[in-house]
Amino acid sequence: MVVGFLGTNSIQISSKRILCPVSGFDSYGTISIEDNHISALSKREAATSSDALPDSAFVLPGIIDLHCHVGSHQSIYGVDPVRILKSGTTVACSQGDAGAATIDQYVAEVIAVAPLYVKLAINLSSIGESTEEGCFSLSEWIDVAACIDAIDRHRDSVWAVSVNTSHHACPELDPRSLLKAGLKVAAETGLPILYGMRRPEDWSLADQLALLRPGDVVTYCFRKTPHCIVENGRVLECVLDARVRGVLFDVGHGCGSFDFDVAESAVRCGFLPDTISTDLQTGHVTNNILHDLPLVMSKLRAVGMQELDIFRAVTETPAKIINEPKRGSLCAGSIADLTVLMESESACQLTDTNGNMRCGKVWTGRQLGS
């Protein structure tokens, strides 16, 4: 790779491979940057001896993690944003780390000062993820009007309303009432829902999905238990119907929400996740578990998802979902967020959250310039 500084605000970056899912560009190339925005993307005939990166390295639009936990002091699940940036992720979307009662502090102490771009799926629970108890343990933590007001105060920082109806999040409250309240907030504010499913013995998955709207996002889509979108190797009809209606599906790997068998069955059936995300949280840090977005991308490749679909699921698609049209692309006018990915020379052992194994080459990433 060659980085040329043409002036105070002008840079040219050349690499053996530059890839942009939006434009279809995949070639030797040069990215021209003016005032932190891309001014041009052009092909080169061949690599040169001055290209410093190995052959396996290439440049993508800055990758976007649609579901993670950001902010090491503001949420019990939150991770230092510096850790996220080091893996090459340039946009981190917090899943419910702040609610109406905590969003002002979260914006000031995380979003405003983080070294990468952070957007929030505001928690329907006013306390966010600030307690070891489930965020919907008490009914008084659900305040539709307060949530709407918080979104209005921080419209530029909020991309969705987070409604996690899992048994852990709401052990006593009726999950139907939670989703109803979340949908009211979403309708009033024009935002999508980021939805965590309830176990089917409490509420059928078909009935849950039927309430979601086009543009709403279901996370933890490749979990095996207590809910699963696959049965006997086939994707459930209610899940396929939801996708036809425009409901979106996100990986949300986490500490217990990614199963190779489920993912492999879904991919084999042509059911690809719309977005790939880590659900990175303190459990990964405290247990010294290597976990980042390029690694989760590698796991999707190991179950048969094609590279271009993977790259799109961490750039173009999440940028659209969070309403950031100048991100996730290398087209002229886009913000100059860039990620460098490098591929391992040989296959490595990959593990899902249930201890199952697959083998595959692994991507590692860094932000360009880091």
Q: Locations of the language-model features?
A:
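Divalent metal-coordination and catalytic microenvironments
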Residues: 16, 36, 56, 67, ...
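A conserved glycine-rich beta-strand in the N-terminal activation segment of trypsin-fold
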Residues: 24-33
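Hydrophobic faces of well-ordered beta-strands that scaffold small-molecule active sites
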Residues: 64-68, 92-94, 118-122, 159-163, ...
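Divalent-metal coordination cores built from histidine and acidic residues
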Residues: 82-167
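Active-site core of metal-dependent hydrolases
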Residues: 165-266, 270-287
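His/Asp/Glu-enriched, well-ordered alpha-helical/loop segment
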Residues: 261-343
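C-terminal cap of metal-dependent C-N hydrolases
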Residues: 335-370
